[in-house]
Amino acid sequence: MKYAEISSLAIEELKEKIKIEQENLRKLKFAHTISPIENPTKIKNTRRLIARLETALNVKGS
């Protein structure tokens, strides 16, 4: 998601999206621990997406 798309989301949508992506990151890390996943950059990209979402949430919350 681009930051412009993220900033257009409502606060509740941001919170829900953060929960979904955190669960997704947990599953990716678990799968990578058991056997290496095909594209390990998914972990990095998901982590960065969560950071973008949390930043947008903090900006809107202020």
From Swiss-Prot:
<comment type="similarity">
    <text>Belongs to the universal ribosomal protein uL29 family.</text>
</comment>
<dbReference type="InterPro" id="IPR001854">
    <property type="entry name" value="Ribosomal_uL29"/>
</dbReference>
<protein>
    <recommendedName>
        <fullName>Large ribosomal subunit protein uL29</fullName>
    </recommendedName>
</protein>
<dbReference type="GO" id="GO:1990904">
    <property type="term" value="C:ribonucleoprotein complex"/>
</dbReference>
<dbReference type="GO" id="GO:0006412">
    <property type="term" value="P:translation"/>
</dbReference>
<keyword id="KW-0687">Ribonucleoprotein</keyword>
<dbReference type="GO" id="GO:0005840">
    <property type="term" value="C:ribosome"/>
</dbReference>
<dbReference type="GO" id="GO:0003735">
    <property type="term" value="F:structural constituent of ribosome"/>
</dbReference>
<dbReference type="InterPro" id="IPR018254">
    <property type="entry name" value="Ribosomal_uL29_CS"/>
</dbReference>
<dbReference type="InterPro" id="IPR036049">
    <property type="entry name" value="Ribosomal_uL29_sf"/>
</dbReference>
<keyword id="KW-0689">Ribosomal protein</keyword>
<dbReference type="Pfam" id="PF00831">
    <property type="entry name" value="Ribosomal_L29"/>
</dbReference>
